Design a protein with these regions (language model features):
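Dynamic "connector" segments at or just before major functional cores
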Residues: 1-171
Length: 171
């Protein structure tokens, strides 16, 4: 039995007044279209915004091209899409679907990509707790991240469970 599509087009949330539409007629193809669904889910639960709030950005605002929420969102979405290596971001920084999901169709300044590359994201991932240094101007609050994981878990349930079992595998 052949598959039947009920719609020729599927519309997602607009980005900077532009329509984002999935068409099934064969035009430009991307392997990252799942990012649009992840982005819609994120907008409903606020994961990226809440996770980004666990970091402190000490960078000079007038010199920042990629804001903290964009950095965190780019990394979270890439991990969810299966891109676990930071080196992947030198290619992903030019991906129009990932950029649209993050609400960035283009960079604010000439010569920059819409999203960050591996070096900038490396500084985010290795953000130390405490005072900023020359190369680490983004810090994290480990306790806030731990609280967020618990909050997200509890938000996903109608009533808090009687018991939570953490099954940690050290292998």
């Amino acid at each position: 039995m052949p598959a039947e599509c009920s719609s020729d087009r599927f519309e997602f949330a607009r980005v900077a007044s532009r329509a984002v539409v999935a068409g099934f007629d064969g035009g430009t193809i991307t392997s990252n279209a799942g990012a649009l669904l992840l982005g819609a889910t994120d907008r409903s639960i606020g994961l990226v915004q809440r996770f980004a709030a666990c970091f402190v950005d000490h960078r000079a605002p007038d010199q920042v091209e990629h804001g903290l929420t964009t950095l965190v969102g780019q990394r979270v979405l890439a991990l969810a899409l299966g891109y676990e290596d930071l080196a992947d971001h030198d290619h992903l920084r030019h991906d129009p679907v990932l950029a649209a999901t993050m609400g960035r169709l283009a960079a604010r300044r000439a010569g920059y990509a819409a999203l960050a590359g591996k070096s900038t994201l490396n500084r985010l991932e290795h953000a130390p707790a405490g005072e900023p240094s020359r190369y680490h101007r983004i810090g994290h609050d480990g306790a806030a991240i731990e609280r967020l994981f618990v909050e997200l878990f509890l938000d996903a349930h109608r009533t808090p469970p009687e018991e939570i079992v953490l099954d940690l595998d050290a292998t």
